[in-house]
Each structure stands twice: as structure tokens, then as C-alpha cells.
């Protein structure tokens, strides 16, 4: 009986049938977009201009394809992040607009920096601030096209001026807090037990993200303990936003912030004791859009520096898709820049896809062996996500089509198996 090593046509047909039925259109672990209406916010790993500051002038420090540098769809600054620019004097004017928003930043404010507002403060409080900031930011950018950072002016009728309360130097990084602004104690007051107010106006944006912060604990000054309390009062609507100190602690005391989404209007900042704080910067949100989940790429150092998972905590379904690798960050330019795994994730920005989902991006919109979870776009076997519900509304037609195709695949497999068995029996009989 003759024998051949080549794959018989019928065997090849069987393999292709199985591959089509069980491995077609798998989700890709990338960030991508459905069309050209997208924008990326980043740091040095996507800052095309940073090459001018380097001794080794090549683009290996970036995790994006250099071809994207001329796209006009990136706002990024080496050494910075949206959180740093929002709170500190180290400022970059992050500005961008798009329907599909991608974030790849945050690593420049981690436990490696170890920021503390007070000498005996607690960096964990600031990690909590970071998580709350990005939670509000991601949720809002699922509903708005445009993001920018703006300054806020205020009017204070007292004689005291702004004071620097929070400054920290670590690992060569100096950070000075300037949002919110602290108003100093009036010289006519013997202590901090007095009420003070300042006026500020929010205008020019659809919504504003502003900080409301207190020292959550017993603040000691001149042998007296103070319970911090801060309020923002909307003069136009009568709505009062408040944040009070609730912890009975004296050590590990640090500034704790919540992040409010305020509408345009006239506001009064109020303090009942301790220092009055006034927002000096805001995230300006403009141009409402249909609900579109944002995409976040994990932003972390090589393991020789301490990182955090605050952006992962902030990025939750259904408003956010989180993308990550399973290995350590290991750059080629240096240990913290140019990682192959993250470059692979960002490579999805070079092309359009049909569908974005929890599992990844689907290139095609017909049939997939993986059922898209929390899908957005033209997705295989599923229609667009319905917001306000943690489940997907599915179009029955693709489901029927999938069932028909799977049924055909099963019939083909059964037929081929029967054919092979019959053919083998004939061959054995002839042999």
C-alpha cells in the first residue's frame, strides 16, 4: 500500500473547517479605534518631542509607532501625567478631542515618587486620591469628546494670601501642590477656629472636574487640634457640596480629596476651621457624545521601581476597557522605556477594528469564536452595548447566523469523518 507525507486534500479541508469553526476572529489584546475619530493622552512613552531632549536620539523610548507622531491625535509629555498637571506646579497643558479616547499615562505619580503633603504624612492617601481622580475622569470621558486643563480664578476679601502647604522632594522629583490653593490664616485671628469664604466662577465648559480636599484627621497646630471641613456652594442652584474630617488620628495625616463634576455657575468656597481651600485648576469637559467606553493601558515601571494599580482600579466596566501584559515592563531604550509587550498593545492604533470589547478588539464584524462582552461598535454576534445596564442587548440575526454556520460545520465534520471511515475500510479491504 502506497504512503505519502503530504496532507491529503480531504484532511486539509477538515483542518480548515475546524479552524473556521473554533478559532476565527479572536479578540486582540490591543487598544484601537473604529475610525479616525480617536485621541491618546500619554507621557514619555508616547511623547514624540521628547527625542530632542535625549542623548541617544532614536524613538526606541516610545511604545507607540513613530508614524503616529504626525497624526495630531496625541497629547503627551515626558515626566508628566494628567494627575500631576491637575494638582501640581509641574504642569502640562493636556488638550485633546475624539470620540474614542485612550489613556496611557499615570506612571509618573506612583509610590516610587512617594509624595506626602506633610513630613509625617501618608502616600497611601495620595494613591487613593489618584484612584478617585481617574475614576471620575474615565467615567466622564465616556460621555465627552473634549478634555483640557484650565485655570480658575477666585476672589477672597480677607488680607491673607495663598500659602504653600504641600511640597515633597524624592528620587530627584520635586512636587509642589497648587490645586487646591490654600488661603493663609488671617493675622487678626488668634487661631484657625473661624469661618472664611472665597468666590469663584466656572464657565466655558459643559462640566468641570474640581478637587474638594481636607486633612482627614486631627490637624495639630500650636497645641490645638482642628477638624478640617470644606464646602463648595453653588449660588445659582443652591446645591452644597461638603467634605468633613472624620478620622480620629494624628499620625499619618495627609490631604484626602474627592473629585466633583460641577456645572457652570457661581460658587462660594467655605471653610469652618483650619485653612480655606479654593480650586485653582479644573478638567474642562466639552462636547457631549453618545456613550463610548474609554480605553486604558496599564502605566507602570520596570519592577526595580515601585508602581501601583490605581488606573486599573479606576477603569471599570462598562465605561472603560483595561489593557495590560502578563510580564514585567522591560524596555529596550532603558528598563522603563520601549517594552515589546506594551508596544504590541499600542500597535492597534495603526489600524481600525470593527468592535471593542472587554476581551480586546475584534477586527471583523461577522462571526467570532469568542462572544464579545460589553461590546462597542459593529461586533460579531452582538449589537452595541446598552448603557445603564450591566448586560448587552444582542441582535438575534447574528446569533441565528452563528448557529447555522456551526450546524453546517458540524455536518461537514460528521460527513468527512464518515467518509474517511468508509474510505479507510475500502482501502483495508483492498489491501
Swiss-Prot record:
It catalyses: N-acetyl-9-O-acetylneuraminate + H2O = N-acetylneuraminate + acetate + H(+); N-acetyl-4-O-acetylneuraminate + H2O = N-acetylneuraminate + acetate + H(+). It is a single-pass type I membrane protein. The keyword Disulfide bond applies. Glycans are attached at residues 53, 93, 151, 157, 199, 244, 248, 309, 324, 352, 366. GO terms for biological process: fusion of virus membrane with host plasma membrane. Residues 421-431 are intravirion. Disulfide bonds join 48-69, 117-166, 205-284, 213-257, 315-320, 355-379. Keywords: Disulfide bond, Glycoprotein, Hemagglutinin, Host cell membrane, Host membrane, Hydrolase, Membrane, Signal, Transmembrane, Transmembrane helix, Viral envelope protein, Virion. The chain crosses the membrane at residues 400-420. Its EC number is 3.1.1.53. GO terms for molecular function: host cell surface receptor binding; sialate 4-O-acetylesterase activity; sialate 9-O-acetylesterase activity. Residues 275-387 are annotated as: Esterase domain 2. GO terms for cellular component: host cell plasma membrane; membrane; viral envelope; virion membrane. N-glycosylated in the host RER. InterPro entries: Capsid_hemagglutn (IPR008980), HEMA (IPR042545), Hemagglutn-estrase_core (IPR007142), Hemagglutn-estrase_hemagglutn (IPR003860). Pfam families: Hema_esterase (PF03996), Hema_HEFG (PF02710). Belongs to the influenza type C/coronaviruses hemagglutinin-esterase family. Homodimer; disulfide-linked. Forms a complex with the M protein in the pre-Golgi. Associates then with S-M complex to form a ternary complex S-M-HE. HAMAP family: BETA_CORONA_HE (MF_04207). This is Hemagglutinin-esterase. It comes from Murine coronavirus (strain DVIM). The gene is HE.
